[in-house]
Design a protein with these regions (language model features):
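Active-site HxH/HxHxD metal-binding segment of metal-dependent hydrolases
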Residues: 1, 34, 90, 94
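Metallo-beta-lactamase
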Residues: 4-83
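Accessory terminal helices/loops
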Residues: 52-126
Length: 126
């Protein structure tokens, strides 16, 4: 079996995702998949780059699901990766505004498509 590793920073600076192309799935750890994405030191620019690379890889290699480190039974899909990318782009363009809320040491969040993205403003907006 061959496993490919992709650097997927945003949740944390060192986040990685592991892909098994032969079996069409991957393991995303905390980088994706919990419907509660926490940007601990990450930025929306990083998340946009990470979701772009991940979506391209999933499309190219027919990856159907990414299994997260939390919330088993809730795998990440290509559509959710694309939704997270869109949400992030809207935050940086000013089209989407975050809500204030202290959770897990993060002071803001956005919510849509069944996904929370929690972050620290203004750091994550740079």
């Amino acid at each position: 079996r061959q496993i490919e590793v992709m650097y997927t920073p945003a949740h944390t600076p060192g986040s990685t995702t592991f892909f098994d192309k032969e079996h069409h799935y991957g393991f995303s750890g905390d980088a994706f998949g919990s419907t509660n994405l926490l940007l601990f030191g990450g930025t929306f620019k990083q998340l946009i780059a990470t979701t772009s690379r991940t979506a391209s890889y999933m499309q190219k290699h027919g990856i159907e699901k990414l299994f997260p480190g939390h919330y088993q039974g809730n795998p990440e899909t290509l559509q959710r990766i694309l939704d997270e990318k869109k949400m992030s782009e809207e935050v940086l363009s000013g089209k989407r505004k975050g809500e204030k809320n202290n959770t897990s040491g993060l002071n803001s969040y956005i919510y849509d498509y069944g996904v929370h993205i929690r972050y620290n403003a203004p750091e994550a907006l740079r």
